[in-house]
Amino acid sequence: MEEEKKAPIRVRVNRSLAFFCCLAVLPETYGFGGTRPTLTVSHDNSCDDYVTVVPLIPTGHYVPGEGWQAGSHSLVTVDDKTYMALCDYPVTIHANCLGRGLGYVWPANERNGVLKALAHHFLITKENLL
């Protein structure tokens, strides 16, 4: 049986004036429905060093090798828009990581581990964090 190849999950970040526009790329061979995750970042380049990443799950969430899964969720309102989001996956990353591309992000409550749910829909919002 041929070993299944897992395409890397990449986040491409384009900077434009005072905001970032990001696109998360899913492996072509996985998932259902063909909906690609997008990241929209509202961030003032002159201030906050940290931003919060909230995985969005419009119809569920994505597990590498398993595709889209049903999951618990809550409503999150950001910039007057309401999104579906996982309750338990907010993470904190340094804004400088965005410029280099996101390979891994570190959960705020688990500094020694990496967030494995990189294929989720992500929403990044500007926040002042401790």
Question: Where do the model's predicted regions map?
Answer:
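Short Pro/Gly-enriched beta-strand edge/turn motifs at strand-loop
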Residues: 20-23, 71
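Residue-level detector of bioactive/disordered segments in secreted/extracellular proteins
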Residues: 23-24, 49, 89
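Mature extracytoplasmic/luminal segments of secretory-pathway proteins
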Residues: 18-19, 84
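Mixed-charge, Lys/Arg-rich low-complexity intrinsically disordered regions
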Residues: 1-16
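Compact nucleic-acid interaction/catalytic patches
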Residues: 30-76
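C-terminal terminal-subdomain/extension
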Residues: 5, 74-130
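An N-terminal domain-cap segment
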Residues: 22-32
